[in-house]
A protein has these predicted regions:
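Membrane-anchoring hydrophobic helices of lipid-metabolizing enzymes
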Residues: 1-21
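Short acidic capping loops at alpha-helix termini that bridge into adjacent secondary structure
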Residues: 21, 43, 76, 94-95, ...
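Conserved beta-to-alpha transition
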Residues: 109-110, 124
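Acidic, glycine-centered active-site loop in nucleotide-sugar glycosyltransferases
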Residues: 110, 115-118
Length: 141
């Protein structure tokens, strides 16, 4: 299923990713190629240009000859900004906006905006529409 020339979802579903309805994923976004079945994306979520979502980690077990395989969850009505990186095993709640370039290495609760490297919560109480727009900004943390 090709949404348009800039967004592709069906390809990732064929690879085994669990992707909800009305999602848009940039063609340049990278969804884990080694363990695509470990990536779960909720309805109405946007994954923007060159964002990366991982569900495996070779570095932790490289010396012992094994890799870590885990599931990475992204909730409903989320936006993953350009060049953001979601690390393996992270759970991102619903209505979360991940700023461009953020590196998310810990789970994030619902209704937040996260930014930075490592990512931290900068706003709570946000609401994101099903079109990926921030409806309520919430309060600064």
């Amino acid at each position: 299923m090709l949404i348009n020339k800039k967004f592709i979802v069906g390809y990732h579903r064929l690879r085994g990713c669990d992707i909800g309805e009305n999602c848009k994923i940039s063609k340049s976004a990278i969804i884990d190629r080694a363990h695509p079945k470990g990536v779960h994306i909720g309805d109405n979520t946007r994954v923007l240009i060159e964002a990366m979502i991982l569900a495996h980690d070779y570095s932790r077990g490289a010396l012992e000859g094994y890799s870590m395989w885990c599931d990475t969850y992204i909730g409903k009505n989320c936006v993953i900004g350009g060049r953001a990186m979601i690390m393996p095993g992270v759970k991102i709640g619903d209505h979360v906006y991940v700023a461009g370039g953020a590196v998310v290495s810990r789970s994030v609760p619902d209704h937040c905006i996260v930014a930075g490297n490592p990512a931290r919560i900068v706003r709570k109480g946000t609401v994101i529409s099903d079109k990926g727009q921030i409806v309520e900004k919430g309060e600064r943390v």
